[in-house]
């Protein structure tokens, strides 16, 4: 079974369920009860019905309507930047490092939207953002 790790667990649940939905044909999906399929999928991985996924199969349609579909992934992109920036503090050996905190404030926060956000991030990190810190935070890096 998958242990709870907060929000990271939520993403794992959704990913596992998504993989199960994509492992069947459209014809098979039309014959299924979506709620029952979801319940059986989550049980297969040792996940309880009482701990609901963030979005249930039957009401996640909002991502496919209007302009929200591309905007939804901006949350994931923000999480990439967040985890990578926090990784700088872990690399410094002190998440309360005053010098690094000042650099973050000076290179990103104080600039606001006066410069391109990715340029600001590169100014802080010295490179473009990478996804590895996010994968680690969400338990998707294969280390556990």
What are these regions (language model features)?
Residues 1-11:
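Single conserved hydrophobic/aromatic residue that forms the stacking wall/gate
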Residues 2, 41-42, 89, 122, ...:
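Hydrophobic alpha-helix position signal
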Residues 4-5, 27-31, 50, 67-71, ...:
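Hydrophobic alpha-helical scaffolding
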Residues 9-24, 48, 53, 60-87, ...:
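C-terminal substrate/ligand-recognition segments
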Residues 17-44, 48:
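Long hydrophobic segments that form regular secondary structure
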Residues 21-24, 45-49, 80, 84-93, ...:
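A generic secondary-structure signal for well-formed alpha-helical elements
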Residues 31-41, 54-58, 79-83, 91-105:
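Active/binding-pocket-proximal capping segment
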Residues 94-142:
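C-terminal amphipathic alpha-helical interaction region
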